[in-house]
C-alpha cells in the first residue's frame, strides 16, 4: 500500500514550515522493525535499571521503569510474542526536523491523513525517549546532525473501533 504511505508523507511535506525551511524528513520503517524494537527495548531496560537504582528518581516515573523491565523481559523470553512497544504494526514513520514546531505540525497533518485513509496510529513516546539516549538508534534511522526526532508514528489497521472519543477536560480559553 505504498500509495497510502506516499499520501501520508505528502501530508507532512506540504505542511508549512518556519521561514519555509522545509527541514522535515521522514524515515519509513517496515523490514527493520524487529531490529529497531530490539534496540529500543534494550535501551529502555538499561534506562529502567538506572531509574530503579537511583533514589532521586521521582516516584511517578518508577511505574515506567517497572513497565520497561516487563516489556524487555517479555521480549527476551519470546521475541515473536506480544509486542508492547509497536503492537505488531507493519509500519513506523519517524518524523525528524531541525525545528520542533515544523516537525510537530507535519506530524499532526500526517495523523489526520492516516485517519482519513482508514488507518490507525499512535505516537510512541517510549521510542523517542530511547532514541534520545542511544545514538545507535539515531544512526539506524539516518538522523543527521542538527536534526531531532520529533515523533514516531506507529501505523496500521486498527483492531478495534471506538464509538466515542476519550473524556477530556474542558478547554481553557481566554477571550479578549
Which residue stretches match the model-derived regions?
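Acidic, surface-exposed loops and disordered segments
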Residues: 1-176
Amino acid at each position: 500500500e505504498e500509495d497510502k504511505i506516499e499520501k501520508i508523507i505528502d501530508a507532512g511535506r506540504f505542511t508549512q514550515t518556519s521561514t519555509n525551511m522545509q527541514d522535515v524528513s521522514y524515515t519509513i520503517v517496515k523490514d527493520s522493525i524487529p531490529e529497531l524494537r530490539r534496540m529500543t527495548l534494550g535501551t529502555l531496560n538499561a534506562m529502567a535499571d538506572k531509574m530503579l537504582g537511583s533514589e532521586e528518581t521521582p516516584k511517578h516515573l518508577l511505574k515506567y521503569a517497572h513497565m520497561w523491565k516487563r516489556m524487555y523481559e517479555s521480549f527476551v523470553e519470546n521475541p515473536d510474542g506480544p509486542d508492547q512497544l509497536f503492537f505488531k504494526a507493519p509500519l513506523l514513520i519517524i518524523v525528524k526536523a531541525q525545528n520542533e514546531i515544523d516537525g510537530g505540525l507535519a506530524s499532526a497533518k500526517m495523523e489526520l491523513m492516516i485517519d482519513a485513509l482508514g488507518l490507525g496510529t499512535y505516537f510512541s513516546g517510549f521510542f523517542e525517549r530511547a532514541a534520545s539516549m542511544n545514538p545507535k538508534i539515531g544512526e539506524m534511522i539516518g538522523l543527521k546532525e542538527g536534526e531531532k526526532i520529533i515523533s514516531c508514528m506507529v501505523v496500521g489497521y486498527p483492531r478495534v473501533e471506538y464509538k466515542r472519543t476519550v473524556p477530556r477536560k474542558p478547554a481553557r480559553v481566554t477571550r479578549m
